[in-house]
Amino acid sequence: MKRPSFSVLANARHAPEIVACFRETEQWLPVTLAYLGLRPIVYPYELQLRTGEVAIFRERTDLVIFWMVFARRHYPVRSSEQVIIDVGANIGLFTLFSARQAPRARILAVEPFPDTRSSLLNLIERNGLSGRVTVSDCAVAASSGTAVMDAAVGVPSQYRRIYAAATTTLNARHRGSPALLQTAEGVPVCAKTLAELLDTVNVATADLVKMNIHGSEYEVLMSAPAAALQRCGRIALQYHELPADLHLGKKELFEHLGRSGFRLVSDRDTQRGSGVALLILDRS
């Protein structure tokens, strides 16, 4: 068996992220080794940040999301931002990150799945953020009403999604075979359009909208009128690859947002069916 120190050196491409993890927490070594698959940690795992915040990882995917948000800085947050919307908040790791990075921001965390939302609320309360963070229990969709979410046992919380035939095979490796059998009989949740969600924060515009909703980003953003989209200053978007026969992908999505005045600033495509893009509204 390889010693962890030598195995870490073999992962030199992760060096900047490892340094970032070191800066975030005194527990950087066990977290790094677990992320790299070199030495597992036992879940639930409590993580204390150097800045005082606490997060609880209940499964490996929580650790991966922590790494994406805090070490890789998937979603950039400006300190000057006043209103941030976290669509697909999950257990709240980006909410926690953005609250620290933008200390004057009000945050709307959107998480419709009941069990996951309970973890989100616990994280918010434990870190003293109840005065700054509002939690919405509605999914964001093309139309308001009721939607249905994954109910299959064993699906990691980060991969639960609104039921739609077009997204059945998304993240199949992570979601497991039970999720592939999902029908429209899942967990019913309320649904709001993007415009209705923006009305929730009771301001003209949101400085940043982060969105990771596992394939639903296409219907949400492409159905939204320009007037609603233009209430978003920046969109940090995790996009997913849909089946080829739909003829709908990131190109069409970026073009649609471009027609509403958005400029693509960065696009990190994993070449494995997903990517993260940052788009900024050009108000000139």
Write out the residue ranges for each language-model feature.
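Phosphate/nucleotide-binding beta-alpha loop and adjacent structural elements of enzyme active sites
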Residues: 1-284
